[in-house]
Amino acid sequence: HLQEDKKCFICDSEDPFHDTLNPDSHRIENVVTTFAPNRLKLWWQSENGLENVTIQLNLEAEFHFTHLIMTFKTFRPAAMLIERSSDFGKTWQVYRYFAYDCESSFPGISTGPMKKVDDIICDSRYSDIEPSTEGEVIYRVLDPAFRIEDPYSPRIQNLLKITNLRVKFTKLHTLGDNLLDSRMEIREKYYYAIYDMVVRGNCFCYGHASECAPVEGFSEEVEGMVHGHCMCRHNTKGLNCEQCLDFYHDLPWRPAEGRNSNACKKCNCNGHSTQCHFDMAVYMATGNTSGGVCDDCQHNTGG
């Protein structure tokens, strides 16, 4: 830190941070916001001199992600990007690029202004070398400048839905001495360090739940944790209420839309079966009123 007399410390992150026993531990869990009075005593710190560094959050279920606020102990990155995955890390899409010099760091990427809420641009507002500490990088998934006509549309829902969030730092800010002297000891003066990383969102239930519980196998005692197992209603089931309950396949599964619950509907098998499946051809043939087909009919019945 430029304002401190002593500039070099030996870090030991083998054990978690402790105010007195291990104050020089800088593990990634230190970025979890506590809002405690001593929050500036702990931070995450990257390896010295390394420019390409990644922080990845792997969530236990689908979530609605709304915004990210990162508070840095060091200079903010000269270049970075935020990415998302909605299929547990199989594929990734860029949310936004950030750079002091967008054209140099991310050539070919528009610098805006945004024309649509899902435009991918490079933002220069959060990449200045000043302040040298406690500078923020802020990202909102839905820019308040855009009026969202239908928040339940697939386009908006897909923008919000994540299972993984990845922040890639690609360029360090330096004071220029590394350009005159390429020795490792010069480069090692620079690194990324973060006090807080606030990730805001809520459990993702397609409108079929109003509360969430802990996912099986995950701790429920983490303070402030948003749980990922939806307490499903409207005859739905699954971690995210993404399926109809068994024997509720008379209508296709749909997400709720505003005041319309789009609840799954029970099949009508006249008491001769407890199993059914949805058939789109049957649904369309009935004028989109009933698509449930009874399976394993009993009592000498069929159809």
UniProtKB/Swiss-Prot annotation:
- Can you tell me which residues are glycosylated? 52, 288
GO cellular component term, pick one: laminin-8 complex
Keyword Glycoprotein on entry: yes
- Which superkingdom does the taxonomy of this entry point to? Eukaryota
The UniProt subunit note reads as follows: Laminin is a complex glycoprotein, consisting of three different polypeptide chains (alpha, beta, gamma), which are bound to each other by disulfide bonds into a cross-shaped molecule comprising one long and three short arms with globules at each end. Beta-1 is a subunit of laminin-1 (laminin-111 or EHS laminin), laminin-2 (laminin-211 or merosin), laminin-6 (laminin-311 or K-laminin), laminin-8 (laminin-411), laminin-10 (laminin-511) and laminin-12 (laminin-213). Interacts with ITGB1.
**Has the keyword Thylakoid been applied to this entry?**
no
Summary of the function given for this chain in its UniProt record: Binding to cells via a high affinity receptor, laminin is thought to mediate the attachment, migration and organization of cells into tissues during embryonic development by interacting with other extracellular matrix components.
Q: Which residues cross the membrane?
A: none
Domain V: region residues: 202-303
Query: Primary place of residence?
Result: secreted
Keywords of the record: Basement membrane, Cell adhesion, Disulfide bond, Extracellular matrix, Glycoprotein, Laminin EGF-like domain, Repeat, Secreted
List localization entries: Secreted, Extracellular space, Extracellular matrix, Basement membrane
Q: Which PANTHER family match?
A: LAMININ SUBUNIT BETA-1 (PTHR10574:SF233), NETRIN/LAMININ-RELATED (PTHR10574)
| Record-annotated Laminin EGF-like domain positions | 203-266, 267-303
Q: Which InterPro entries match?
A: Laminin/Netrin_ECM, Laminin_N, LE_dom
Choose any GO biological process term that the UniProt entry carries and state it: negative regulation of cell adhesion
Tell me the ranges covered by the Laminin N-terminal domain, including all copies.
Answer: 1-202
Mention one GO molecular function: extracellular matrix structural constituent
Pfam families named among the record's database cross-references? EGF_laminin (PF00053), Laminin_N (PF00055)
Q: What's the protein here called?
A: Laminin subunit beta-1
Source organism per entry reads Gallus gallus
The beginning of the lineage is: Eukaryota, Metazoa, Chordata, Craniata, Vertebrata
- The gene coding this protein: LAMB1
Q: List the disulfide bonds.
A: 203-212, 205-230, 232-241, 244-264, 267-276, 269-294
